[in-house]
Amino acid sequence: MIYDTTLPYPRDLIGYGQNPPHAQWPGGARIAVQFVLNYEEGGENAVLHGDAGSEQFLSEMFNPASYPERHMSMEGIYEYGARAGVWRILREFEKRKLPLTVFGVSNALQRHPELTRAFVELGHEIACHGLKWIHYQHIPEAVERAHMQEAMDILQRMTGQRALGWYTGRDSPNTRRLVADYGGFAYDSDYYGD
């Protein structure tokens, strides 16, 4: 299907044009930087999690097939991150006294309470990265809303804090509205524009 170019286009490709707003950062800074660590190990697709197959979307492997059984190499990639990689990153940020935002998948954080406590004790922000990895494109809106509520409840219970950031990662046409309806978020990282 080709879109009729004589009709109004539903996306804003113009934005501010030649007159973008200029942010006034604290202390006269000219740029703001946010360091983000995606913590997803234990939230990826895996038959152990009740999924039809193994993860294939995000991996160090090139174009892996999804297996309808345990994929030991794929599991190993995620296990390294949870068992070793994340601790190495935390030590480096702690050494430099740098703040970190963790995009935490709720089911992944549940599977590693020691790490979740470390994130909180080190003062790092934990933004909600959904319940688990699900492609929400064709999931009913009510299910997506229920998953958002469950993910936020898990984070609140585990950290004692309400997440101020949201990042689904595999969003749907409903996600942004659901985030706005849920309310209380300072930002939504599913939008990559300005």
What name fits each language-model region?
Residues 2-194:
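Catalytic alpha-helical scaffold of carbohydrate-active enzymes acting on polysaccharides/glycoconjugates
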